[in-house]
Regions:
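Amphipathic alpha-helical coiled-coil/heptad-repeat segments
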Residues: 4-57, 198-252
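Positions in alpha-helical segments
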Residues: 21, 62-65, 147-150, 190-194, ...
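Residue-level recognition of specific faces of alpha-helices
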Residues: 36, 66, 183-186, 191, ...
Length: 252
């Protein structure tokens, strides 16, 4: 092992502290940018699915505290009247790394499996674990899903994508309300069935979804750039450390 004199070791340590400190600062800037961009996404979705795209639309009180005012021509309905709900019959051990179909479990990661039990448009929600009521997926095609994942499908009066964006953004209020009373470690069927949704006319839903898709696409592109900058900064930091401790650059 190469071991420079103690004076040189101290000089290298001081050099690395300065250089790495600046790089870490730049990384923190990018991480904060990503946090702000994710907050912006949530704000865009919230405003679009509860207020619509017309800022001059007449508003009325929804009667639901966490929804607030909505355009007066929108409807308010509970989820039980908007879709069918069922759970899967598979466990995580059924996954196959090279499986033919998506396998929705209780985490943001989509696994693979060689079977499918559903073919169509659906919104999947984690029913328990750390992702309970917080992990959602939109699917349209053949897939399988975990026994503690809710499959919301056969949508009525609401498009699948509008439903997805709404519940992705708003179901957290149900979780927070439950957490204020006790620990929420699972989502019960009645919590989904009794969940209130705003329902614009179908044509308006389509315009809202198109708007959200476009805005999120632009934001995700910025997030990807920020993540790439973080990768490059970490690579630069590692390169500087390697060169300094192997004597490839002179620091004193």
């Amino acid at each position: 092992m190469f071991c420079p004199p103690i004076e040189e070791q101290l000089a290298i340590a001081s050099y690395l502290d300065e250089k790495c400190g600046k790089i870490n600062g730049a990384i923190d800037v990018q991480k904060k940018k990503i946090d702000l961009l994710n907050e912006l996404k949530q704000t865009i979705i919230t405003n679009a699915v509860t207020k619509g795209l017309n800022p001059n639309a007449p508003m009325i009180d929804s009667g639901v505290e966490w929804i607030g005012q909505v355009p007066e021509h929108w409807k308010i309905k509970r989820t039980r009247f908007l879709c069918n709900i069922q759970t899967g019959d598979k466990d995580t051990v059924n996954r196959e790394d090279d499986g033919l179909y998506p396998f929705y479990v209780r985490s943001p990661k989509v696994e693979r499996i060689n079977t499918y039990s559903f073919d169509g448009e659906a919104v999947l929600m984690a029913g328990d674990g750390v992702g309970a009521g917080k992990v959602f997926h939109y699917a349209n095609g053949k897939f399988d899903y975990h026994q503690r994942v809710y499959n919301l499908h056969n949508f009525k009066d609401v498009s699948g994508l509008f439903f997805y964006y709404y519940i992705l953004n708003k179901f957290r209020y149900i979780i927070e309300e439950g957490a204020a009373k006790n620990t929420v470690d699972s989502v019960r069927l009645n919590m989904i069935q009794d969940f209130w949704m705003t329902i614009p006319p179908v044509s308006e839903q389509q315009n809202i979804v198109k708007y959200i898709d476009g805005e999120i696409s632009k934001i995700d592109a910025q997030i990807s750039k920020a993540n790439r900058r973080i990768e490059l900064l970490n690579e630069l930091k590692q390169s500087i450390i390697t060169e300094a401790i192997t004597g490839k650059i002179k620091v004193c």
